[in-house]
């Protein structure tokens, strides 16, 4: 029996997959629970259409992420902080600080997409990785300078 899965089913497939199962399993388990629909020509055509729409949407998201990555590489960020002995900062520079500085320069990013393993605690230049998409990552150049007293 051929079925189209509506949701992920363990040991069988993911939502949207066309699967071949034993008639009893399909009739008595998958169909009554709404986990699958029969694979008639109408449903198969609808599935193909949904996959095409999803692929187009994914391509659009990836393209916009690549554009943001390019913009990030062209947008250096300079942050001024109070400094103590040996160029150590009072406090630290976090992903939120970098996101706010980028927002001030016209690049809107969620702070969770900025990958800082640990906050920046010294003066200097840093390459901070940014995860924009599952396949696209960018880098932003962050310069931390001593604030004039």
Curated annotation (Swiss-Prot):
InterPro entries: Ribosomal_bL9 (IPR000244), Ribosomal_bL9/RNase_H1_N (IPR009027), Ribosomal_bL9_bac/chp (IPR020594), Ribosomal_bL9_C (IPR020069), Ribosomal_bL9_C_sf (IPR036791), Ribosomal_bL9_N (IPR020070), Ribosomal_bL9_N_sf (IPR036935). GO terms for biological process: translation. It comes from the Bacteria. One of its GO terms (cellular component) is ribosome. Keywords: Ribonucleoprotein, Ribosomal protein, RNA-binding, rRNA-binding. One of its GO terms (molecular function) is rRNA binding. PANTHER family: 50S RIBOSOMAL PROTEIN L9. Binds to the 23S rRNA. Belongs to the bacterial ribosomal protein bL9 family. This is Large ribosomal subunit protein bL9. It comes from Anaeromyxobacter sp. (strain K).
């Amino acid at each position: 029996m051929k079925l189209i899965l509506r949701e992920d089913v363990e040991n069988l497939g993911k939502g949207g997959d066309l699967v071949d199962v034993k008639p009893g399993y399909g009739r008595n388990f998958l169909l009554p629970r709404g986990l699958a629909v029969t694979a008639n020509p109408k449903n198969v055509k609808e599935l193909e259409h949904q996959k095409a729409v999803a692929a187009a949407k994914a391509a659009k998201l990836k393209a916009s992420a690549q554009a943001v990555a390019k913009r990030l590489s062209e947008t250096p960020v300079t942050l001024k902080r109070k400094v103590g002995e040996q160029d150590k900062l009072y406090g630290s520079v976090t992903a939120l600080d970098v996101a706010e500085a980028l927002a001030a320069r016209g690049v809107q990013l969620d702070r969770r997409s900025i990958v800082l393993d640990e906050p920046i605690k010294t003066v200097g230049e840093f390459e901070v990785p940014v995860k924009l998409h599952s396949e696209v990552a960018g880098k932003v150049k962050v310069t931390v300078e001593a604030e004039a007293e």
